[in-house]
Amino acid sequence: DNMCCILATSPLLLNEDIVVGYERLIHSDFSSIVPIVQFSYPILRSYGMNSEGEIYFNWPEYAKTRSQDLESAYHDSGTFYWHKIDRWLSGDIKRGGIVVDEDRVQDIDTEQDWKMAEIKYKMLYVRG
């Protein structure tokens, strides 16, 4: 009836997150549950950069807004996903999210990402 896809690059994943995601899935009208993480800084104050290295505000209307006054934004944690199989296969997609802590998430695409995952792991689990 349901499936969980756990990504191999999620070494900080906790069983509790999977359980919370499952409970959210079965007790909601969502077809999928995605763990999400809050961006550490409001993306509405983000910059873009052109090929000459010149930077510009992606949203210039927020250039003078204090960061603490801007709405939070979230990104996929890249750890796991829950799906109701029949709705997923039929394309009837309605996603719900569960928020997970930034210190337990690390996207791993580069060697530097792996080093950050090791640092977070030591911070969370190594006593000494």
Specify the residue positions occupied by each region the protein language model found.
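Alpha-helix initiation/capping motif
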Residues: 72, 106-107
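Short aromatic-hydrophobic micro-motifs that form the base-stacking/packing surface
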Residues: 4-6
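Basic/polar N-terminal segments that are highly enriched at the extreme N-terminus
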Residues: 52, 127-128
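Conserved core of the sugar-phosphate nucleotidyltransferase
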Residues: 2, 11-99
